[in-house]
Amino acid sequence: MGSSGSMVKPISGFLTALIQYPVPVVESRADIDKQIKQIIKTIHSTKAGYPGLELIVFPEYSTQGLNTKKWTTEEFLCTVPGPETDLFAEACKESEVYGVFSIMERNPDGGEPYNTAIIIDPQGEMILKYRKLNPWVPVEPWKAGDLGLPVCDGPGGSKLAVCICHDGMFPEVAREAAYKGANVLIRISGYSTQVSEQWMLTNRSNAWQNLMYTLSVNLAGYDGVFYYFGEGQVCNFDGTTLVQGHRNPWEIVTAEVYPELADQARLGWGLENNIYNLGSRGYVATPGGVKENPYTFVKDLAEGKYKVPWEDEIKVKDGTIYGYPVKKTIHS
């Protein structure tokens, strides 16, 4: 294992570890059980190496892998909460850390499954459950999330939100997290190298546009088809990169995070306090700023009428290119 970043817990704020987990090659339920044991082992060993560690993050697909021929089968799916999350909860409690985990979740109402992330606290309680709002279509078959973008209390004065991989390419997702009070946005990903530059760019822009820290980590290594880039990244609230990992499987990227500084920027900045300025436009000329929405896409999206001008000419609107049948029934 290699490591990049900080070694000790700061007096204020918290120490985080982003695990560039090797992409799992999963063929059976036994392989999933093996990954769960490995993740738990990694929690304990990382805590032993970094006694001040308070938040450990595992990337998307680290539990169940990316076997596209089997990933929606009953054998591969998990219930949330369920036996697998109970094991993660026990490990977090034993090591006294917050943990972020990836689960491909069986739909409790039937129909297509969800791509889910959870946060477990040092008491072993699941304090956040998030379902990916924007599956990476047309590759992914997951149902779009229906839990919104929840925020929870975390270590060192943090307010945590989680997004999953492709979610982070949408500035609206990061803005929603910040608008609901998050000062730290965690992004867990399973991207291959084709979008590594865009991934790093959006991690920075999501931080800057919302005056919040972003903690992002991707799978690492080769699964026989694609190479996954790792490159764990911690961005400051001003959009600069504090720590950047490499493309090594098992690299541990650590950083000291100071949520209070993001909070102070949101309260004290005039110039570039853009999350506030969005809803208070031109407050020098107009006391309190202009509140009315000037954005057509926001209005149309809210009314369920979002449509880009070239929509009728778009070529790919279903999953047939990746072998998924066109759906005949729409699940609510």
Swiss-Prot record:
It comes from the Bacteria. GO terms for biological process: putrescine biosynthetic process from arginine. Belongs to the carbon-nitrogen hydrolase superfamily. Aliphatic amidase family. Pfam families: CN_hydrolase. Residues 14-259 form the CN hydrolase domain. This is Formamidase. Its EC number is 3.5.1.49.
